[in-house]
Regions:
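N-terminal amphipathic/basic-hydrophobic helices that include classical n-h-c signal peptides
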Residues: 1-12
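Thiol/selenol-based redox catalytic cores and closely related redox-interacting motifs
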Residues: 48-129
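Local sequence-structure signature of Cys/Sec-based thiol-disulfide redox active-site neighborhoods
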Residues: 12-37, 41-46
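General helical structural elements
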Residues: 6, 25-26, 32, 110, ...
Length: 129
């Protein structure tokens, strides 16, 4: 996995890991917010360096939410696989996100043993309190 270190550390509040797609507007907005606040963070573009099932399972576990809540319902593959028409368990959802990176919502921000889907980007504050 390739990490990109953001060079911001003036008033580092927390060490954060941001799982993102660099071309995503929300991901760009999150990076700008963190940089403006002087918060140090690392970045992983999981569309360039795909995550494996175990990495996704760990992320899901840290959110405390069901895996299917990380699905991007607007992606064509979501409809093609009929994911909105049936129940999908965590194991299947994780396997599908590993196989189809575009299915996973972004950005996901991790701090220690907790993670949030930063949509809207202000949700990152849940990890900073």
């Amino acid at each position: 996995m390739r990490l990109v270190k953001a060079s911001v550390s003036v008033n580092a509040v927390a060490e954060l890991m941001v799982y993102e797609k660099r071309t995503c507007t929300t991901c760009k907005n999150l990076a700008a917010l963190l940089e403006e606040r002087g918060i140090d963070f690392d970045r992983v573009d999981f569309h360039v360096e795909p995550l494996g099932e175990e990495e996704i399972r760990e992320l899901v576990g840290k959110t405390g939410r069901p895996a299917q809540e990380l699905f991007r319902a607007r992606e064509p593959v979501y409809a093609e696989l009929g994911l909105g028409e049936r129940e999908v368990g965590d194991d299947e959802a994780i396997a599908l996100m590993a196989e189809h990176t575009e299915l996973m919502q972004r950005p996901v921000v991790v701090r220690g043993d907790r993670a949030v889907l930063a949509r809207p980007v202000e949700r990152v504050n849940e990890l900073l309190d």
